[in-house]
Amino acid sequence: MQKISNEIFLCSICNVSSGDCPEDCKYCTQSAHYGTQIQRYKNKSIDKIVQEAKTLREYGALGFCLVTAGRSLESQKCEYIAKAASAIKKADLGLHIIACCGSADVDSLKYLKTNGVDSYNHNLETSKEFFPHICTTHTWKERFETCENTLKAELGLLSGGIFGLGESWGDRIELLKHLQILSPHTSPLNFYIANESLPLPMQTLSPQEALECVTLAREYLPNTRLMIAGGREAVFGDNQKPLFEAGINGVVLGDYLTTDGKAPKDDVAMIESYGYVAATNCH
């Protein structure tokens, strides 16, 4: 099982294009439907992206994820991400480059691979049955198909979900069963962060329920890296050790897409204080 090692994989997120997404995902501050107070911008400069990659690598990050708002990996976006990935590879930082750019076809994903992208992240988010309650502008089936396309393109797959949207335990189990089918090398696990501008209830999972979600994920995905992402600070505060004891072996380092995280050095110090060390390779 993945949790046997005391190594924690550190991954950082680079929000290269933020906000004004046409999709209506009720949990997402980047949706243009809800008027959330976030930074909105199009396409960071390639130089800035490479500099962020260098900085996070110095803190121990092995993964670097290029994230864009929007429904899909259309041609202009694909070209931009390919250029960014190629520039990072040329910098010879030893990073595992991940792209997270919405729905994508096989040819576009293959193009990213030829330009330096190692893996693609596309989360199922929740069960097929519950998904229409949180998004109406695209389907769960589209998400699953993009994950299948990622595997067909011979890219590594990251796929996970978000807990605390109002889903049942049955929904959580169905999500994990479908992730079992896909067998991603990494599954990002998020906890919903309540936001008064979003249409979901203003409630946060209790630490106990969140831990039960992690334990369940480890049971269904024994050989998958479980990466804790958004919501860990909101739910667990400064007592995050139980997450690692429950089977988490990957952490998103630093800030999230539109939410501040801890300073990277503080995350690293916290992990080391629990008796874990930053992984030094991706395997």
Curated annotation (Swiss-Prot):
Upper classification of the organism: Bacteria, Pseudomonadati, Campylobacterota, Epsilonproteobacteria, Campylobacterales
Record InterPro entries: Aldolase_TIM, BATS_dom, Biotin_synth/BioAB, Biotin_synthase, Elp3/MiaA/NifB-like_rSAM, rSAM
Family classification: Belongs to the radical SAM superfamily. Biotin synthase family.
Record note on quaternary structure: Homodimer.
Superkingdom of origin: Bacteria
Assigned EC number: 2.8.1.6
Matching NCBIfam families: bioB, PRK08508.1
UniProt-listed GO biological process terms: biotin biosynthetic process
Pathway(s) per entry: Cofactor biosynthesis; biotin biosynthesis; biotin from 7,8-diaminononanoate: step 2/2
Role summary: Catalyzes the conversion of dethiobiotin (DTB) to biotin by the insertion of a sulfur atom into dethiobiotin via a radical-based mechanism.
Cofactor note: Binds 1 [4Fe-4S] cluster. The cluster is coordinated with 3 cysteines and an exchangeable S-adenosyl-L-methionine. Binds 1 [2Fe-2S] cluster. The cluster is coordinated with 3 cysteines and 1 arginine.
Keywords: 2Fe-2S, 4Fe-4S, Biotin biosynthesis, Iron, Iron-sulfur, Metal-binding, S-adenosyl-L-methionine, Transferase
Protein name: Biotin synthase
Reported cofactor(s): [4Fe-4S] cluster; [2Fe-2S] cluster
Keyword Cell division part of the UniProt annotation: no
Domain Radical SAM core: 3-232
UniProt keyword Metal-binding, yes or no: yes
Catalytic activity line of the entry: (4R,5S)-dethiobiotin + (sulfur carrier)-SH + 2 reduced [2Fe-2S]-[ferredoxin] + 2 S-adenosyl-L-methionine = (sulfur carrier)-H + biotin + 2 5'-deoxyadenosine + 2 L-methionine + 2 oxidized [2Fe-2S]-[ferredoxin]
GO molecular function, one term: iron ion binding
UniProt binding sites for [4Fe-4S] cluster: C21, C25, C28
Binding-site residues, [2Fe-2S] cluster: C65, C100, R225
